[in-house]
Every structure is written in C-alpha cells, then in structure tokens.
C-alpha cells in the first residue's frame, strides 16, 4: 500500500510545472508558447532571466527529491523507491494539471537522484555543470548526464536502482530528440550563463 500511495504522490508532485507556475507568478509569458516552447529551467532562462530559471530549477528538482523522500518515509525501498522517482519524472514530462505538456525532466531527474543517492546525484550534477560550461548547450549536457546516470548508478553499486534510472535516461534522451536534430543542423541555441 505504501508503494501505491508513494506512486500517486510522486505523479501529482511531478505534475507541478514550476515553469508555468513561476511564469504566472512573475507575470512572464507562458514558457510553453515562448522561446523553445519547453516548460523547463533552460527555456525560463531565455524567457524570464536567471531569477526565474533558478526558481524553476529549484522547484523542479525539489519535487523529485520530495517524492522520493516521502516514499522513504513510508518505508519504500530498493527498486520500488527508484520507480517512485521514475513516476515523479513521468509527472514532470506529462503533467495532469497542464494538459500533459511538461518539460524535459533534467532537474526533476537530478532531484530524484538526490533522494536515491547523494553520490550518484553529485556526479550527475557535476557532469551536467562541466559539460554545459564547456559546450554551452543545455541539450548536450542533458544527453551526457542522462547517459552517465545509469553508469554512475552501477559504479555506486546501486544496481537495484538501475532499471528505473535507465528508463529515466531513455525518456530524457527521447524528450531532447528535437534538440539533437537542431544540434546536427547547427540551429540549437546556446545557454547564456
């Protein structure tokens, strides 16, 4: 029963689109219809600046972390705990409150990983920061981080988390597919940090 309750909470928390919420609170354009059209922190950086992007990043990561922490509190463990994190990411990608139009899941994945394992999260976040600092493309950083997450999970010895983390990575790569096509064509926007 604790697992089912955790799954429901994770999806409902994941469905909170902080890009849309922050845009409304700060009287900014809807990120789903402005910039890249993505309800995420990188697009909010373009649409509303650093402060708006920071709030979105914090909110999107926090909901993933909180979903996993609630499940931990309810004594959900191992692969079941990682599946709760996956559902939080699915909520972000397909939010019930916002007609199933969500973001791409990078910040939420990082929050989920932080709830699962501090060290895995630390290495994934460090990977994202290093890659975006070098290449200035959020999508490249997302790709490398998504590929790295299952690898770091194996290195950390948390093979019980591996399958859900692998699914999260595949979902993130799929959600960034258009970005990768723009990268190939040379039309992808760089991130201005």
UniProtKB/Swiss-Prot annotation:
Q: What domain of life does the UniProt record list for this protein's source?
A: Bacteria
Q: Does the keyword Transferase apply?
A: yes
Name the pathway.
Lipid metabolism; phospholipid metabolism
Give the main location.
Answer: membrane
Its UniProt entry gives the catalysed reaction(s) as: an acyl phosphate + sn-glycerol 3-phosphate = a 1-acyl-sn-glycero-3-phosphate + phosphate
* Annotated keywords: Cell inner membrane, Cell membrane, Lipid biosynthesis, Lipid metabolism, Membrane, Phospholipid biosynthesis, Phospholipid metabolism, Transferase, Transmembrane, Transmembrane helix
Q: What PANTHER family does this protein's entry cite?
A: GLYCEROL-3-PHOSPHATE ACYLTRANSFERASE-RELATED, INNER MEMBRANE PROTEIN YGIH
Give the protein name, as stated in the record: Glycerol-3-phosphate acyltransferase
Please tell me the species this chain comes from.
Coxiella burnetii (strain CbuG_Q212)
